[in-house]
Amino acid sequence: MVDESNAGPVAPAVVADAEVKAPTGKKRSSSRPQKAPPEPAQPKMPAAKRRGYSEQERSEKLRLIETKVSEGNTLKDAIKSAGISEQTYYHWKGAAKSAAREDIERTRPLSAGDEFAELVQLEEENQRLRKQLAEKLRTENTELRKRLGLD
């Protein structure tokens, strides 16, 4: 029979398994080429300088766009011919609309005050005319009584 107490050949098998099961780190391939360092990006075209338009120029461009649209051009073409972007057009249009509302609101209290003053004046004139009418009716009544001999 074989002697089982001899563990000589079994030990290397366990050691071999231990080496196989040992965690191995991620191996890097040295054959992959290195990336070139990034070059500084150069702008293709210089950015367009932002241009500020005065209120008068804005309103003129908005009127120009409105006339072109009324002539039959598309809104997009009219905006392009005015030399502004669609976003700018809508921004200016909204600002013009809100400015018009503010103007109306500012003039309302003035016109309301004028209307109130006119109303007061009309009421005074109405009172004066009523007094004149009452006086005229009294004088006519007294004359009629004298003619009829009722006094």
Curated annotation (Swiss-Prot):
<feature type="region of interest" description="Disordered">
    <location>
        <begin position="1"/>
        <end position="65"/>
    </location>
</feature>
<keyword id="KW-0804">Transcription</keyword>
<feature type="compositionally biased region" description="Low complexity">
    <location>
        <begin position="7"/>
        <end position="23"/>
    </location>
</feature>
<feature type="compositionally biased region" description="Basic and acidic residues">
    <location>
        <begin position="52"/>
        <end position="65"/>
    </location>
</feature>
<dbReference type="InterPro" id="IPR002514">
    <property type="entry name" value="Transposase_8"/>
</dbReference>
<keyword id="KW-0614">Plasmid</keyword>
<keyword id="KW-0536">Nodulation</keyword>
<dbReference type="GO" id="GO:0004803">
    <property type="term" value="F:transposase activity"/>
</dbReference>
<comment type="similarity">
    <text>Belongs to the SyrB family.</text>
</comment>
<protein>
    <recommendedName>
        <fullName>Probable transcriptional regulator syrB3</fullName>
    </recommendedName>
</protein>
<dbReference type="GO" id="GO:0003677">
    <property type="term" value="F:DNA binding"/>
</dbReference>
<dbReference type="InterPro" id="IPR009057">
    <property type="entry name" value="Homeodomain-like_sf"/>
</dbReference>
<keyword id="KW-0805">Transcription regulation</keyword>
<dbReference type="Pfam" id="PF01527">
    <property type="entry name" value="HTH_Tnp_1"/>
</dbReference>
<dbReference type="GO" id="GO:0006313">
    <property type="term" value="P:DNA transposition"/>
</dbReference>
<keyword id="KW-0678">Repressor</keyword>
